[in-house]
Amino acid sequence: MQVLPPGSTGGPSRLFILRPVATTLLMAAILLAGIIGYRFLPVAALPEVDYPTIQVVTLYPGASPDVMTSAVTAPLERQFGQMSGLKQMSSQSSGGASVVTLQFQLTLPLDVAEQEVQAAINAATNLLPSDLPNPPIYSKVNPADPPIMTLAVTSNAMPMTQVEDMVETRVAQKISQVSGVGLVTLAGGQRPAVRVKLNAQAIAALGLTSETVRTAITGANVNSAKGSLDGPERAVTLSANDQMQSADEYRKLIIAYQNGAPVRLGDVATVEQGAENSWLGAWANQAPAIVMNVQRQPGANIIATADSIRQMLPQLTESLPKSVKVTVLSDRTTNIRASVRDTQFELMLAIALVVMIIYLFLRNIPATIIPGVAVPLSLIGTFAVMVFLDFSINNLTLMALTIATGFVVDDAIVVIENISRYIEKGEKPLAAALKGAGEIGFTIISLTFSLIAVLIPLLFMGDIVGRLFREFAVTLAVAILISAVVSLTLTPMMCARMLSQQSLRKQNRFSRACERMFDRVIASYGRGLAKVLNHPWLTLSVAFATLLLSVMLWIVIPKGFFPVQDNGIIQGTLQAPQSSSYASMAQRQRQVAERILQDPAVQSLTTFVGVDGANPTLNSARLQINLKPLDARDDRVQQVISRLQTAVATIPGVALYLQPTQDLTIDTQVSRTQYQFTLQATTLDALSHWVPKLQNALQSLPQLSEVSSDWQDRGLAAWVNVDRDSASRLGISMADVDNALYNAFGQRLISTIYTQANQYRVVLEHNTASTPGLAALETIRLTSRDGGTVPLSAIARIEQRFAPLSINHLDQFPVTTFSFNVPEGYSLGDAVQAILDTEKTLALPADITTQFQGSTLAFQAALGSTVWLIVAAVVAMYIVLGVLYESFIHPITILSTLPTAGVGALLALIIAGSELDIIAIIGIILLIGIVKKNAIMMIDFALAAEREQGMSPRDAIFQACLLRFRPILMTTLAALLGALPLMLSTGVGAELRRPLGIAMVGGLLVSQVLTLFTTPVIYLLFDRLSLYVKSRFPRHKEEA
């Protein structure tokens, strides 16, 4: 047993140094817990930060946007507006469809929100039209969130109606049952139905009306209870042939008698098996298809949900005929997995680089092994805590662990370097470990808690940005905390067992060359430091200039919100003139699809035309462009978008808007471009006055591109102006007029066919092939009081007007959304400021309000809190350091190093052409924690030298700088190399990781050079200031 010198207590490390078995087993337990925890951690793109969002869709075929707004949307909005926890309510009412999107506060559980929505729908039921084909349907899904998976179902042998029927009953329902799936939509609208197309001339010749036909059909097809007979011996259930199942049966239906002869439906109408809505269509790579979009519930794990769907797909497709093919066109998890794999590789690369730099400085394998064990142990142990906190393996937590490699190795390096110094002086390894660990223990604690203090403000950030970075901050803090524990336990214990004078002195040619190089560097630094200390005011001027430069760079640097990712999927909107029909839009999408599929980067394409819950108007079409994997194409997504828009620009009468899908979805509406700005008024008339003015002003701004709005008030409308007196004289009510028009032109769902597996509709309409356009109104006939028929033209005048194609509300008031992108050379911050300046110039009245939406609104909130976030980080660190040092002065000396980090980070971002977004801001905040480590190591040793050796402040700080130069250089290079893989990232998701790496590498490079000289000067300045205060106020001295 070694005899320990007096004072070799080892501090908190003593017990662990003297009990190596217990220490080893404790570390093994941490390692095992981390390995087990890793197996249970889910994989995701980003932390779960989704707002609880519910979409309510109501379909009312044939209803105009005005009718949908007043009769459907408004009653629902009034009930929804009374729900607690509602953050925002938006609605879109178009021809035949009402979509209300409800976004709740982050703190409200989705299941609670669902209960409130269901109760509100129930309360509004009595206020809704009595002839709604279906009640409002709600889905726990954000409509702006892109599908996690898109499947195309095609067949070259079966009609699309049969294909959709099979997909709906055999595939879609099963996928809907998967945990995490919020909504499965079948785009294409080929739901089977019996279509009855009335011949207006035929029914008029027979003195019949469409209402007569409708009544006959609804009365002939019923499916209701008929009772049972209960006799003395047996019970008998009653049934009847009260249903008609096929078009042939309906064709033979007798609807009236003329002169004793039956008039069958087939005599006055074309009856056929068709689709429920003939104005819906979807195509996959230009082939007619049923496109199945699978959307997840807010908060659901996308990887687990997609894996479950993939597992069941083979079994589901086996139940389909061989002529029906199911193709997975897009799977967002493919890019998510690739991004996570790339980040994991960068993590391993960072570990390798850090270990390499350690060996370069220590030039000793045993000494390199010790931190080589500490780094993975600290990182793996973090996984155990992540499991208990319900975190996931995602880009941000992996980025935190990658950055942590440079942090966690710092503590081990400081301990090893200090213990090695004593061993080289001749101390026994055990005594050196006890003495070195005891001496450095306070420094480790200071480094750890001051660094964690920097992360504390991130935990208190509000709203979605705070939720986004909570996992990042906590993961990093846990890794740093475990690192401190390892450095005070395992590291000194291993030093006592693995290091010796012989091993440290054993050198080869490489070691001797490195040693000579380091000696020369330290000597050069010493000479430079001596000169700096002799000219303190020049150094202070440099420090002050650095502070001013930081402020200037902060003001001028382009600012953004979140990096635009290349996930390999592009969402698009095709816009045509407002009066465009379904047939013309189908033709236009074919032309556009042909151009898009010619691009070498495009792998597949789906297009959709028609009005449903996802597409508001007939003059717009939805596109989803799936790109080839990143390693199989030459261009990034923004270059592909520019190329596609150029290719389509020559097609007359269309405008194509494209934007890449993102993992972070804040919006609640599918937008044409990345950013949104709303104009809201109390009336539609006020909007119609100000929308053109604001749109023209925004389109003239160079900071904005592709400016458009969803305001469409030039749709063609036929106004039926009924002479109520004439109608009343003939016994015709307005209800009769509405019914006649609805029967003829509304694709009216008049009856339901029930089967064992599904329900199908009977659709009534006029056959307008021979009388297209407004001429079809001349064929409408109404039944008068005496039983005769009267043409509509006898009581009404037809006027052609303009009407809105859709009416949008935000929190129950009319609103228009302006969509825009930011052109190259400008930032989102530039665009936001330009819009605000334009708004002031227009001098909008008080009843007109504006607001940014989605990511632009989040950008404003994040930008407003950024400065306070950095101030909070500095204040938190000052408090921690003040408590640790029991001093008001020394924390200021340490914090004086921070402007150097800001200058380096901001300069690096500007040189790299990167914006100051929230990822880069997190990097700057982390730099605050890293850079101050240099000052802590210098000041700790300087104070100890003054206290224990009686040195003057100048001699103490000079010696401390030289003694700590090597560990400072080593720890800084370790942190720099830990961030270097992120800066040089090129794989999937690199856009997300690169700003963090750029900010940290730039900040470390500049701060490393400056703080080595500015810190000792500022230390001496504050020392003189302290002496001056004590001399002026002797009471302070006495109390001290």
Curated annotation (Swiss-Prot):
Entry GO terms, CC: plasma membrane
Tell whether Cell inner membrane is among the UniProt keywords: yes
Q: Which InterPro entries match?
A: AcrB_DN_DC_subdom (IPR027463), Acrflvin-R (IPR001036), Multidrug-R_MdtB (IPR022831)
> What keywords does the record list, in alphabetical order?
Cell inner membrane, Cell membrane, Membrane, Transmembrane, Transmembrane helix, Transport
- Topology class, membrane: Multi-pass membrane protein
Its transmembrane ranges are 25-45, 347-367, 369-389, 396-416, 440-460, 472-492, 537-557, 863-883, 888-908, 910-930, 968-988, 998-1018
Coarse class of the protein's main subcellular location = membrane
Subcellular location, record wording: Cell inner membrane
Gene Ontology molecular-function annotations:
xenobiotic transmembrane transporter activity
In which domain of life is the source organism classified? Bacteria
- Gene3D superfamilies recorded for this chain? Multidrug efflux transporter AcrB pore domain, Multidrug efflux transporter AcrB pore domain like, Multidrug efflux transporter AcrB TolC docking domain, DN and DC subdomains, Multidrug efflux transporter AcrB transmembrane domain
What the record says about family reads:
Belongs to the resistance-nodulation-cell division (RND) (TC 2.A.6) family. MdtB subfamily.
Subunit: Part of a tripartite efflux system composed of MdtA, MdtB and MdtC. MdtB forms a heteromultimer with MdtC.
Q: What is this protein called?
A: Multidrug resistance protein MdtB
Give the source species: Salmonella dublin (strain CT_02021853)
